[in-house]
């Protein structure tokens, strides 16, 4: 028996927006009769930037900034046609990057 999975990978800088988007996707998938595995939290990517505080000399005075990219993974097992249609029509937050693999 051949089962089809939909793998959804979400990325965002703000983890609260990411969690609300995953909740929306999970509730939509369960409402249409599909099984959902996840959300699985993936490792957070942290990019650090170090800059001088002043425009002139004084190399000892520096400031660090970081940018965190939070990620989640969802697997939808045996999706129905209603599930696929509902996921395509779903409107998520602007700060969330969605990758869908069939």
Swiss-Prot record:
Keywords: Ribonucleoprotein, Ribosomal protein. SUPFAM superfamilies: Ribosomal protein S10. InterPro entries: Ribosomal_uS10, Ribosomal_uS10_CS, Ribosomal_uS10_dom, Ribosomal_uS10_dom_sf. PROSITE patterns: RIBOSOMAL_S10. GO terms for biological process: translation. GO terms for molecular function: structural constituent of ribosome; tRNA binding. One of its GO terms (cellular component) is ribonucleoprotein complex. The keyword Transmembrane does not apply. Involved in the binding of tRNA to the ribosomes. Belongs to the universal ribosomal protein uS10 family. PANTHER family: 30S RIBOSOMAL PROTEIN S10 FAMILY MEMBER (PTHR11700). Part of the 30S ribosomal subunit. This is Small ribosomal subunit protein uS10. It comes from Bartonella tribocorum (strain CIP 105476 / IBS 506). The gene is rpsJ.
């Amino acid at each position: 028996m051949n089962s089809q999975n939909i793998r959804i990978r979400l990325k965002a800088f703000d983890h609260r927006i990411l969690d609300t988007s995953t909740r929306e996707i999970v509730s939509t998938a369960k409402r249409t009769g599909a099984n959902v595995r996840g959300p699985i939290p993936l490792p957070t990517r942290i990019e650090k930037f170090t800059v001088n505080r002043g425009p002139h000399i004084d190399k000892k005075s520096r400031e660090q900034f970081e940018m965190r990219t939070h990620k989640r993974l969802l697997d939808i097992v045996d999706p129905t046609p209603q599930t696929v249609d509902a996921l395509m029509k779903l409107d998520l937050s602007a700060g969330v990057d969605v990758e869908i693999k069939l």
